[in-house]
Regions:
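Cleavable N-terminal export/targeting peptides
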Residues: 1-27
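Long, low-hydrophobicity, solvent-exposed regions enriched in small/turn-prone and acidic residues
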Residues: 39, 66-69, 86
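Repeated loop/turn-to-beta-strand initiation elements of outer-membrane beta-barrel proteins
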Residues: 72-78, 103-109, 159-165, 172-174, ...
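Outer-membrane beta-barrel "beta-signal"
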Residues: 209-211, 346-353, 366-380
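A short alpha/beta connector and helix-capping loop motif
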Residues: 327-344
């Protein structure tokens, strides 16, 4: 995306923003709420943080979100539609969700045609990664396009335990890098993006189960959480994979704590490239670029000592990860060995904004230092 395109984007999008949260229409237009009596909301671009994003595939992607809550034979439901357009690749993203929700359960039927990231939990399509991609030319996500339907049932409890079961039918296809604009590129030179991940094209029918458990509410005592994820699919290829992630937060003295994290993953069958385990970047292996390791199985550990001050939290940390060689992932991962890193970090605003300086121990030279700035625990 060129600088001229950026000017066009800003000129066209800024007038859309309406602080009052309303959408102007003519006198003869009647809203869904007026006709049906059902509550409804419509939001554009700047009115929600998930309606404007930036990445190396789409460039800027402004969107709109509309929701209506009609009555039905099974009680009130919410119908939510989202649409956005990548201004660099000119491809639309569409999603329609039908949700029935109670105090503990949520059932959602979805239809979608959209860009997605290989690691949904890392939030690469959210605000934090969009900022670093636009400003610094560092996009940690890897993307592909999926089209299909899904049915999801989720349950949560006051004990901080949750269960999610999802059944899906999806068609996957690769995406090319289309954007070439960053703010840093205006100052220095045109950025060279990381190549996007390859994709095994085809239909995949399957299901997934996520079980999460958290314990410990008092920060003066140990706190922990565990996540178990299972997924299986058939169609273009047949596969199954399982992942386990656990973390423990232990206070040691006043304003100081130790945080430990470990994860393992394995798979059987013909695992698609987009369903492989990939490590690298702030969320899995600091000090290394995303997708430095990848394959059909992995193991990783992380240790951190944090001291709280009035201005934020200062930490010393070390990460380690391993992924064995697998010929199916040639060209998608940069390395196949055990990697380690050490570093220091600063987090401010109750751990919302993080700054990390990490040194990968693969090479003992100053150029092995990597700086990262990112958002964490974003409540959207």
């Amino acid at each position: 995306m060129s600088a001229a395109t950026l000017k066009f984007v800003l000129c066209c999008m800024l007038p859309i923003y309406s602080p009052g949260g309303t959408v102007p229409f003519g006198q003869n237009w009647y809203s869904i709420e007026e006709v049906s009596g059902a509550p409804r909301t419509i939001r554009w671009v700047f009115q929600r943080p998930d309606l404007l994003r930036y990445n190396r595939v789409e460039g800027f992607s402004p969107g709109v979100r509309a929701q209506i809550r009609p009555q039905s034979p099974v009680g009130p439901i919410s119908v939510t539609g989202m649409a956005s357009l990548g201004l660099a690749n000119l491809k639309p993203n569409l999603r329609l969700d039908f949700t029935r929700e109670t105090l503990q359960d949520r059932i959602t039927f979805s239809g979608f045609h959209e860009l997605t990231a290989i690691d949904e939990r890392a939030g690469h399509l959210k605000l934090g990664n969009s900022i670093t991609a636009l400003v610094a030319g560092r996009d940690d996500g890897d993307y592909y396009r999926q089209s299909g339907v899904s049915l999801e049932w989720a349950r949560s409890s006051i004990e901080q335990n949750s269960l999610r079961i999802r059944v899906f039918g999806e068609y996957h296809r690769p995406e090319k890098i289309e954007s070439d604009f960053t703010i840093w590129g205006l100052i220095n030179e045109k950025p060279e993006w990381r190549p996007n991940i390859g994709v095994d094209i085809g239909w995949f029918l399957g299901s997934s189960i996520d079980i999460a458990s958290k314990w410990g509410l008092d920060p003066l005592f140990p706190q922990g959480q565990m996540l178990v994820s299972l997924e299986g699919g058939a169609g273009t290829s047949e596969y199954a994979r399982v992942g386990l992630l656990g973390s423990l937060d232990i206070p040691i003295v006043r304003d100081m704590r130790i945080s430990l994290e470990a994860g393992v993953g394995a798979s059987i069958g013909d695992l698609p490239i987009q369903r492989g385990w990939y490590l690298g970047g702030p969320s899995t292996l600091r000090g290394f670029p995303p997708r430095v390791l990848g394959g059909a199985k992995f193991a990783r550990v992380r240790g951190e000592v944090t001291r709280s001050f009035f201005f934020g939290d200062v930490s010393l940390f070390s990460d380690g990860a391993w992924a064995p060689y697998d010929h199916r992932f040639d060209g998608e991962a940069d390395d196949h060995r055990t990697l380690f890193s050490v570093g220091s970090g600063l987090s401010v605003l109750d751990q919302l904004i993080h700054f990390d300086a990490s040194w990968n121990l693969r090479y003992f030279r100053p150029s092995s230092v990597r700086l990262d700035a990112y958002l964490d625990f974003v409540p959207f």
